């Protein structure tokens, strides 16, 4: 299939908290894929989950975790490095 490709930025996406950690911020994603798929894609279609097994203490004592992106339509890819977000310990 020779569909025209398009790039799209989605800003302010909410990351679901894990059992022990919560994200400090929202995420921005860069996506690339068929124009019709990206045009129809809404923030509600995506699920961004905190990967608690990847929590690391970074520079300056900040804790970060990898974010798993689920729900991308077929043919749509995420551009850039693996998304990470600053986290804090959740309330018990």
Regions of interest found by a model, annotated:
Residues 1-92:
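Structured interface patches
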